[in-house]
């Protein structure tokens, strides 16, 4: 039953894009958010669920109010931009992402961290891009820099890596949605969904099963941006899409990508070493 509820929540994120008006978009997001709350109560799994749940409800409520005001009156269009900053975890609203993402099940993490990002398509569809472009690029760039540092200072474990990696993706999607075309954003999202779907399956396996040297190389190939791997194809497509963005943003994205790959490599090696010691 719980899986059906979360599946319905994910479906509503996609439906929100074809509602035809701002109120329909807001209503679908509200329903998706309410349904996703069920994912915090996973039987048989012990999480520190109440602090993340309260944080999620409060931030979702604030974001919802801002979005509702923005879609109802053009004067408050800036509020839509602020709502997306909160939902995507863009600087300075990064903290809730770490708190929530590291204390939920993998299914809910995929829903909140990957599927919900489809809502960024609303930005070019609704023509929201305006005076907020420079501010959006600046905050996205800062988000990438801070996330790069967080890899080495603020995270622990696989879910922590996924959370910070998601912050970088949010920055990329926001910048692309404001500076490029709808189709560029759509292509990037499709590649991201495919790559993340495979990676999430591997991360779930990596967290729950001790790996041996025989599968260590396979994990490196799947997760790292090695030529012909899914991650490499996703990164390569990202490079082509962001070429029209300011050079400063591209440099910050490169910094983030290098930090991400180095930390991921260290994570796999560390997991392998732990397995060897146990054996």
Regions found by a protein language model. Give the residues of each.
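Core, highly hydrophobic multi-pass alpha-helical transmembrane subunits of bioenergetic inner membranes
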Residues: 1-279
């Amino acid at each position: 039953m719980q899986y059906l509820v979360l599946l319905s929540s994910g479906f509503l994120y996609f439906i929100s894009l074809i509602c035809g008006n701002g109120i329909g978009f807001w209503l679908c997001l509200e329903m998706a958010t309410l349904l996703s709350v069920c994912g915090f109560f996973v039987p048989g799994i012990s999480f520190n669920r109440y602090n993340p749940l309260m944080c999620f409800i409060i931030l979702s409520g604030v974001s919802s109010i801002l979005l509702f005001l923005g879609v109802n009156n053009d004067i408050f269009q800036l509020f839509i931009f602020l709502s997306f900053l909160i939902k995507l975890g863009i600087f300075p609203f990064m903290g809730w992402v770490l708190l929530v993402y590291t204390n939920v099940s993998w299914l809910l993490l995929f829903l909140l961290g990957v599927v919900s990002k489809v809502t960024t398509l609303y930005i070019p569809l609704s023509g929201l891009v305006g005076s907020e472009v420079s501010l959006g690029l600046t905050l996205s760039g800062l988000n990438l820099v801070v996330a790069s540092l967080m890899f080495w200072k603020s995270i622990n474990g696989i879910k922590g890596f996924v959370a910070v990696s998601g912050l970088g993706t949010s920055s990329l999607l926001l910048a692309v949605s404001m500076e490029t075309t709808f189709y560029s954003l759509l292509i990037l999202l499709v590649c991201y969904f495919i790559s993340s779907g495979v990676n999430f399956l591997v991360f779930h396996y990596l967290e729950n099963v001790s790996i041996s040297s025989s599968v260590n190389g396979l994990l490196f190939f799947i997760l790292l941006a090695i030529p012909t791997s899914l991650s490499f194809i996703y990164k390569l497509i990202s490079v082509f899409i962001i070429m029209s963005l300011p050079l400063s943003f591209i440099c910050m994205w490169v910094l983030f990508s290098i930090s991400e790959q180095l930390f991921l490599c260290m994570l796999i090696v560390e997991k392998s070493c732990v397995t060897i010691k146990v054996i």
